[in-house]
Structures are given as structure tokens and as C-alpha cells.
Design a protein with these regions (language model features):
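Basic- and aromatic-lined ligand-binding clefts that recognize polyanionic substrates
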Residues: 82-134
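Alpha-helical, coiled-coil/dimerization segments enriched in small aliphatic residues
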Residues: 1-3, 119-148
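Proline-aspartate-enriched helix->loop->beta-strand connector
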Residues: 21-34, 53, 152-165
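Extracytoplasmic ligand-binding site segments that recognize negatively charged/polar headgroups
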Residues: 40-43, 58-72, 105-126
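Solvent-exposed loop/turn segments at secondary-structure junctions
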Residues: 1, 31-32, 37-40, 61-65, ...
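A short, structured surface patch at a secondary-structure boundary
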Residues: 1-27, 31-38, 139
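Solvent-exposed, polar/charged alpha-helical surfaces in well-ordered, non-transmembrane soluble domains
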Residues: 22-26, 46, 50, 64-71, ...
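Structured C-terminal subdomain patch of bacterial secreted/periplasmic proteins
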Residues: 67-88, 166-231
Length: 231
């Protein structure tokens, strides 16, 4: 927000999912950075190429994805010292946190909540992969039904040792209200091992839903502290 308020060089390209090709071309950018995960951004590639505008596409879901992106961008700018600061330093922290896994392989349920629903997420997601690298077993990885149709019966049967919730959208309160409506208000919820042991955690959106970028090490450390005790 501070950057937006202080900058005089911001161009409104429209919405994230529908950027304006006309505005992009009119601004005569040297380089356009786009998301390969957003269909309408991908569709702009041919238009940009034909106009002679350089474009790079990224899909960032894991730290390794972020690392690869930063390597390319710092190669382009020549500012390799920024690579060490924003990638090398968090990478060292991540390596330290991964070593803390003690072989206990705790079982976990990872939920993503938003104002209209709640879904279980597997180890192929950003936070899911972090938990996997820290030695966790995600109960949704081997239960496709849980991913497709979150239900109390399957959760009770698996009885995970830890439950993690990430929220998306502008209102965490609305997202957590939906968790309560669909899950925590059920009397059976209180019988889960994770609840009995106070091992239910709502994770910060800025570190576990949004991409944490140079704070990725902090994300790993927060999870490791929960799982294996604060250092």
C-alpha cells in the first residue's frame, strides 16, 4: 500500500484476470512479467510478441519456483546481489528448518477457507509442500474424496494430529465463519485428536496464502516451530 501511495509511475492495466492489451502496448514497456496460471494473461503472449514487447511468464507455487524466477529476473537486471539477499538467505533458513523433522511424521489436515466454502488441500499446494518437506503426512494425499468433497466422516476416520487453516479473500472473519458453519460447530469436531491437544492453527494469509517471497524462510520456521517446538 505504501508503495502504491508513493509511486507516480503506476499504470492501471485493468483486472488481474483481464489485463488490457491496449494499455500494455501503449505504455511501451521494456519487459512484461505475466502469470502462466492466468488464462487471459497467457493469451496476450502472441500479441506482445508481434508488437516486439518482451514477456516472461511464471507460475509460482513453491520456493523452488520463486528461486527460478528470481534467478531469471536478476540475470536480466544484473543485480545478482539481490538474488543472495532475497533467495540465498531464506534458502539457508529453509534448509535449517527441514533438518528439524524428527521422523515422527505427524499426520495433518490442511484446509483452505474462504467466505463461501472450505476445501481440503494436498501436498501439491504451497503450504502443503512446506508441510510435506517438514515431514508431515497429509491425510488428503491418499483420499481423493476428501479433496473433492470435504466431510466430517472422513476427517474423523483419519483423525489428524494437526489441523492447519489458510484463508483467502479480503475477510478472514468471513472465511473462519464458514469453517465454523461447516466443521467446528459439529459436536464431533471436539473429539478430534488435534482439537483435544490444541493443535489447530489458523495461519497468516501473508505467509501461507499469498506468496511470501523473501519471507519464505519465515513461513517454514513458523511451521517447524509448531510441529517440533520453538527454538
Amino acid at each position: 500500500t505504501e508503495i502504491l501511495e508513493s509511486s507516480t509511475n503506476i499504470v492501471d492495466l485493468g483486472s488481474l484476470k483481464n489485463p488490457s492489451a491496449e494499455t500494455l502496448l501503449a505504455e511501451d514497456f521494456d519487459l512484461v512479467i505475466m502469470s502462466s496460471a492466468i488464462v487471459n494473461q497467457v493469451k496476450l503472449y502472441d500479441t506482445l510478441e508481434q508488437a516486439g514487447v518482451a514477456a516472461v511468464y511464471f507460475d509460482i507455487e513453491t520456493f523452488e519456483d520463486y528461486k527460478g524466477m528470481m534467478e531469471i529476473l536478476t540475470d536480466i537486471t544484473g543485480n545478482k546481489e539481490l538474488y543472495q539477499e532475497n533467495v540465498g538467505e531464506p534458502e539457508s533458513i529453509i534448509a535449517e528448518q527441514v533438518k528439524r523433522a524428527d521422523g515422527s511424521n505427524p499426520t495433518i489436515l490442511l484446509l483452505r477457507a474462504y467466505s463461501t466454502g472450505v476445501k481440503a488441500k494436498g501436498s501439491d499446494t504451497m503450504t502443503g509442500q512446506m508441510l510435506s518437506q517438514l515431514g508431515c503426512i497429509n491425510i488428503a494425499d491418499n483420499d481423493q474424496g476428501l479433496l473433492e468433497n470435504l466431510g466430517m466422516e472422513a476427517i474423523l476416520e483419519a483423525d489428524p494430529e494437526y489441523i492447519f487453516v489458510t484463508t483467502m479473500g479480503s475477510s478472514e472473519e468471513a472465511a473462519l465463519a464458514m469453517v465454523d458453519e461447516l466443521l467446528t460447530s459439529n459436536p464431533a469436531w471436539q473429539g478430534l485428536s488435534a482439537i483435544q491437544k490444541n493443535q489447530y492453527y489458523v495461519l497468516e494469509q501473508e505467509l501461507f496464502h499469498n506468496k511470501p517471497n523473501n519471507r519464505w524462510g519465515e513461513s517454514y520456521q513458523k511451521l517447524a516451530d509448531i510441529l517440533y517446538g520453538e527454538k
